[in-house]
Design a protein with these regions (language model features):
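Active-site anion-handling motifs in enzyme catalytic cores
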Residues: 1-285
């Protein structure tokens, strides 16, 4: 049985996307063992290369040997997808799949990051639906959809998909409001990854609690994302981060590690570390 996987990447600087991809692959491998079936998985992205595959396989305890990659060129409309010759290989590989699982990066099936990103992801879904390939919308966040045309397009995709899975109750409620479909509620697939204690971070001081804080570059740095700068937030994110760290540093039994899960977070991490030199930073890789 051939399975396609879109919207979850191994060749990506976003560690959340990598965790998403490895978790889905791990789940599919467990299904293979339990159901005694063979699944051939194709990730629709460029291959990250042998060294990265071996690293992820080792560190995340996932077998990454028996699946293939199909490079994907995203487009803004189906007319372009239908006519551009350089998409032929991608379209042929999509058609070979018995079903396709879409993760949309976990939280990008929305227009909160702008309409450009939404249409990037959604046109490929529409193509899959038009070709009558069963589409499973995997555990992810849905919405919000602020633009009316975006909401109508999202409703179409949700209702035409074979299975719709959400990873939070807010998304479940939102889907009930905008679409006529029975969505399934589960947890974020990243919880499927094993927790490995025993690395150097846990050996520095065994008596103290190790607290990791991800400082979001998108929210902490000014003008980092034009689509987010237009939003109104209930909380001042920069003030929240400062207050949280200040309170934790008052405790003698805590050791704080500032973490970036995408490359642009590291500028924010470095700025915060200068303000709070007692905090440790974990190098982004």
């Amino acid at each position: 049985m051939k399975v396609g996987l879109i919207g979850a990447f191994l060749n990506n600087s976003n560690m959340g996307c990598v965790a998403l991809a490895c978790s889905i692959i791990r789940l599919l491998q467990e299904i293979e063992e339990e159901e005694k079936i063979k699944l051939d998985v194709t990730l629709f992205e460029a291959s990250p290369g042998k060294e990265k595959l071996e690293l992820y396989s080792r560190e995340l305890d996932v077998d990454l040997q028996n699946f293939s990659f199909s490079e994907t060129a995203w487009v803004y409309n189906l007319r372009a997808l239908a006519h551009w010759k350089r998409h032929e290989e991608m379209k042929a590989n999509l058609k070979k799949c018995d079903f396709i699982i879409d993760m949309t990066g976990g939280d990008s099936f929305s227009d909160i990051y702008g309409k450009k990103r939404f249409y990037f992801w959604s046109n490929i879904k529409k193509y899959i639906i038009k070709k009558k390939i069963p589409l499973i919308l995997g555990p992810q966040t849905y919405g919000p959809y602020e633009n009316k045309r975006v909401k109508k397009f999202a409703k179409y995709i949700i209702e035409k998909s074979s299975v719709v899975i959400v990873r939070d109750e807010k998304s479940l409620k939102y889907i009930k409001e905008i679409a006529n479909v029975q969505a399934k509620l589960t947890t974020d697939v990243a919880f499927q990854l094993p927790c490995q204690k025993g690395t150097e971070i846990f050996l520095n001081n065994e008596k103290k609690k190790k607290i990791g804080i991800n400082v979001s570059g998108l929210l902490y740095l000014e003008n980092s994302d034009s689509s987010l700068s237009e939003k109104s937030f209930k909380t001042d994110y920069k003030e929240y981060i400062h207050d949280l760290i200040s309170e934790l540093l008052k405790k003698d039994d805590c050791e704080i590690y500032l973490i970036g899960h995408v490359k642009c977070d590291m500028e924010a991490v470095e700025k915060v570390q200068k303000l709070y030199p007692k905090c440790h930073t974990i190098p982004w890789q």
